[in-house]
Amino acid sequence: MKLEKTERHGTVREGYQILLRADAELLLPEDKPLMRAFYERMGETCMTWAQAIHGETLRKEFLSLDGIREKSQFGTQRYDFRMRCVWEEDAFAAILCESELLGQWREPQKSYHRISHVWNTEEELVLPFPQILDRFGVRLPKNRLPFRPDGIYPDGDQMVFFRNVTEHTPFLEKKLPRNVNKNNPK
């Protein structure tokens, strides 16, 4: 699958002060119009959220500060959205999207989220979890994972299972071996 790099940049300001820098880097498939449109829309939605919604929250926080000194010490936050193809084999490809919001110098990272899709590139369809597990030879006995995954994708001879950050849990990731030959499980 041939990929084309697309970048988007945005800034949220209040007067002279830069409150947020938002960047998106997308490696979009050139020859797959449905996949391309899907990820273009996702990138646009994430950039809109960063600039309009989170930017407005930062603007209110900045304007509520008293005095020039506190406003001058208000650090710039950074939002990064990256989309790339992490794995490709035959008629299948795994696309990984990572969204990271970096706080000010006092709070190094505010949030990190990951979304993955495994596509049948010939039909341009996203595979559901059970079909991904079956197709890539992963057998999950009960309680093998210490968490319920938000996403899965193949990475070489392993399957990566992950769960995004919530209020009470950190980002979790576990890699399990992938059975290439389904008749001979490892």
Walk through the language-model features, giving the residues of each:
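Compositionally biased intrinsically disordered regions enriched in Thr/Gly
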Residues: M1-K186
